[in-house]
């Protein structure tokens, strides 16, 4: 049975002090959250140790927002799997549309990052998704399939999360219709050929649409951006009830 992963990606938000305040509000709100789901937070690198400290003994798991494929070396601005593990990190987001866009990350580089994560017992959250232009040209499925086939090459699907994030829905307030998101997630599962693969949806996820999204048969969680910065709103997402 696929256990949903509810993950919040804080991006370049939250200082250590803000992280402590956020957790002080959030933790009491998940005291009765069912055990049938994982709860994950991806803070900035600077707040990882703070989150680990404040969240010690809680059910909150930690993700990094990226990971490098080398264990050490002259890679300014990067971070290795071992460095993350030292702080209790369990997951690593790779292939998010922002580094794809701003740093021209290729599917090959994303695959290297994901392989490195798995080799060091981290669970990669591999992001895929089409732009508005690609969608309007009818290229969405082709683009996503290429990202899946190249980005997931050589990975163990049992130790992997895929996040379908249509780029046009990230931070825009636009949400992919639940049925369409479910259809794409089902296609991804069929392309990978693993019925147990965990597939998230991401893109303007909020308390108002979480129940409907989690009621879809092929959506196994969400990767939440802006809405995860509000501890009360993210707690509502964590406490979803299938619509």
Curated annotation (Swiss-Prot):
Reactions the enzyme catalyzes: D-glyceraldehyde 3-phosphate = dihydroxyacetone phosphate
Subcellular localization(s) per the UniProt record: Cytoplasm
Enzymatic class: isomerase
Cysteines joined through disulfide linkages: none
Recorded GO MF terms: triose-phosphate isomerase activity
Gene Ontology CC annotations of this record: cytosol
InterPro entries (UniProt xref): Aldolase_TIM, TIM_sf, TrioseP_Isoase_bac/euk, Triosephosphate_isomerase, Triosephosphate_isomerase_AS
Residues that hold substrate according to the record: 9-11, 171, 204, 225-226
One Pfam family, short name: TIM
Pathway involvement of the protein, from the record: Carbohydrate biosynthesis; gluconeogenesis; Carbohydrate degradation; glycolysis; D-glyceraldehyde 3-phosphate from glycerone phosphate: step 1/1
One GO BP: glyceraldehyde-3-phosphate biosynthetic process
Gene3D superfamilies associated with the record: Aldolase class I
Alphabetized UniProt keyword annotations: Cytoplasm, Gluconeogenesis, Glycolysis, Isomerase
Catalytic residues of the enzyme: 96, 165
Enzyme Commission number(s) from the entry: 5.3.1.1
Function statement: Involved in the gluconeogenesis. Catalyzes stereospecifically the conversion of dihydroxyacetone phosphate (DHAP) to D-glyceraldehyde-3-phosphate (G3P).
Alphabetized NCBIfam families for the sequence: tim
Subunit structure comment from the entry: Homodimer.
Family: Belongs to the triosephosphate isomerase family.
Record protein name field: Triosephosphate isomerase
């Amino acid at each position: 049975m696929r256990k949903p992963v509810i993950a919040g990606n804080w991006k370049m938000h939250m200082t250590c002090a803000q992280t402590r305040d956020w957790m002080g509000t959030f933790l009491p709100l998940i005291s009765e959250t069912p055990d049938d789901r994982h709860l994950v937070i991806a803070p900035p690198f600077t707040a990882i140790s703070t989150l680990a400290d404040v969240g010690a003994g809680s059910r909150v798991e930690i993700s990094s927002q990226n990971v490098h494929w080398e264990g050490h070396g002259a890679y300014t601005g990067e971070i290795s799997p071992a460095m993350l593990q030292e702080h209790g990190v369990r997951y690593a987001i790779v292939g998010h549309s922002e580094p794809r866009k701003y740093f021209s990350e290729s599917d090959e580089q994303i695959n290297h990052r994901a392989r490195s994560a798995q080799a060091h017992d981290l669970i990669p959250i591999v992001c895929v998704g089409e732009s508005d232009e690609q969608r309007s040209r009818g290229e969405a499925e082709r683009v996503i399939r290429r990202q899946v086939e190249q980005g997931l090459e050589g990975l163990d699907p049992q130790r992997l999360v895929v996040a379908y994030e249509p780029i046009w829905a990230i931070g825009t307030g636009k949400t992919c219709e639940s049925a369409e998101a479910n259809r794409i997630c089902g296609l991804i599962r069929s392309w990978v050929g693993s019925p147990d693969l965990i597939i998230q949806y991401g893109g303007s996820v909020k308390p108002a649409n979480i129940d409907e999204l989690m009621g879809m048969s092929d959506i196994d969680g969400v990767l939440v951006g802006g809405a995860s910065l509000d501890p009360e709103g993210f707690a509502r997402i964590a406490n979803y009830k299938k619509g």
